[in-house]
């Protein structure tokens, strides 16, 4: 039995395509793994995720309440399912703030035992499933690839990252007139396959 941390990040609530994607993935995951333990977290509800690192708060930024609490949570789970919409060509602010708070030298990565100078991720027990959405088709804006950023960041921390699911083009053409549920339905087979294998 695995412990699974399920993270939502969208500010759009019920109208969020990434939230619907997350729900659909978890529906299929639970079909295959009904006895797993699930912990749900919406970053919009976490004070930590609204705090951005600046020159004025460096001393307080990594206090236990905002950093160790979430690092320890990751150390106690086996899997992470994280859904993130694209916002202005990148991850949204709550996601960036979360990743900044959990990326701490000698807690989630370290250079101490590196032979070539590269960082060694310390969360190597984790498996991560990334679920992303974006308004434009993949490749329209080459500088904006939040899926690859998320994959790279989790791998930097040592996690094993499954092939991500990207639901793109959600604001283009006919998709702009569809409900989140209708958009996600087109990806149903891909979502089910990924959920069953994660």
UniProtKB/Swiss-Prot annotation:
Sequence positions that bind FMN: 10, 16-18
Enzyme Commission no: 1.6.5.-, 1.7.1.17
Assembly with partners or alone: Homodimer.
Source organism of this protein record: Mycoplasmopsis pulmonis (strain UAB CTIP) (Mycoplasma pulmonis)
Reactions catalysed according to its record: 2 a quinone + NADH + H(+) = 2 a 1,4-benzosemiquinone + NAD(+); N,N-dimethyl-1,4-phenylenediamine + anthranilate + 2 NAD(+) = 2-(4-dimethylaminophenyl)diazenylbenzoate + 2 NADH + 2 H(+)
Function, as annotated: Quinone reductase that provides resistance to thiol-specific stress caused by electrophilic quinones. Also exhibits azoreductase activity. Catalyzes the reductive cleavage of the azo bond in aromatic azo compounds to the corresponding amines.
Family the UniProt entry places it in: Belongs to the azoreductase type 1 family.
GN (gene name): azoR
InterPro entries the record matches: Flavodoxin_fold, Flavoprotein-like_sf, FMN-dep_NADH:Q_OxRdtase_AzoR1, NADH:quinone_OxRdtase_FMN_depd
Textual note on the cofactor: Binds 1 FMN per subunit.
GO-annotated molecular function: electron transfer activity; FMN binding; oxidoreductase activity, acting on NAD(P)H as acceptor; oxidoreductase activity, acting on NAD(P)H, quinone or similar compound as acceptor
UniProt name for this protein: FMN-dependent NADH:quinone oxidoreductase
Cofactor or coenzyme needed: FMN
Keyword annotations from UniProtKB, A to Z: Flavoprotein, FMN, NAD, Oxidoreductase
Gene3D superfamilies, sorted: 3.40.50.360
Enzyme class: oxidoreductase
